[in-house]
From Swiss-Prot:
This is Phosphatidylglycerol--prolipoprotein diacylglyceryl transferase. PROSITE patterns: LGT (PS01311). Pathway: Protein modification; lipoprotein biosynthesis (diacylglyceryl transfer). Its main location: membrane.
Amino acid sequence: MYINFPNINPIIFSIGSFKAHWYGFMYLISFMFAVWYGKKSVEKKNQIKINIENLLYIIFISSCIGGRIGYIIFYNFSYFSQNILCSLHIWEGGMSFHGGLIGAIIAMYYLSLKQNVKILKISDFIVPLVPFGLGAGRLGNFINSELFGRIAPNFPYAFLFPNTYKEDLKIVSKNPELQDILDKYGVLPRHPSQLYEFFLEGIFLFFIIYFFTRKKRNTGSISALFLISYGILRIISEFFREPDPQIGLLKNIITMGQILSIPMIIIGVLYVNLFIK
């Protein structure tokens, strides 16, 4: 009835103490693809006069740093404040998109000053490349069997993730009717929310931006579309994603991801109404 989580080793290979993880490999592939697509876009549209590799490298590094810091602050500050060295274990997962966005904005602001280019021109160029990283990150989450979805006992294509037992016990203690399912399968069936987000925030968002950018747009409109679209898609996907156990549902209603996405939508809508005519 349900789908067993595929037996995927999160480590691709190891040489001595060095271990290559799928999670990091996904981001590497997305970066390489973004460089290729970015060069192709510049050649076709002649958007900006900045070295593409340097631009993407700086923004990529800044977004990774921001993503890690954002995760620490927004999602698990109490743990990392007591385990500071664990903050460096990026290969184990634990990145915040919203933190990464802040890091990318800081990098773009720096580059805009250094290269004397409007920051919105840089962001309009970068935005179509972002879904590559988002999609890659979600596939990495799936391989790591992390950020799994909420329980879905009535969904025949729900996944049986191998590392949800502790959380499932807490759920069964409050919902004893699920005990039989837990006894039979060992874990509770859940939505593969990582795959939902891969399709929504990766593939679907890419095509939204792709078709929008086929025509010449006012400066900032592509960035505004991204803020609005991602914010909406993230809020939707969060309804299928298990809230982080250390936070849960804030006020028993809303997730941290949804809270952080609301300002994105507001800023995008305000920019469209105030500056794009």
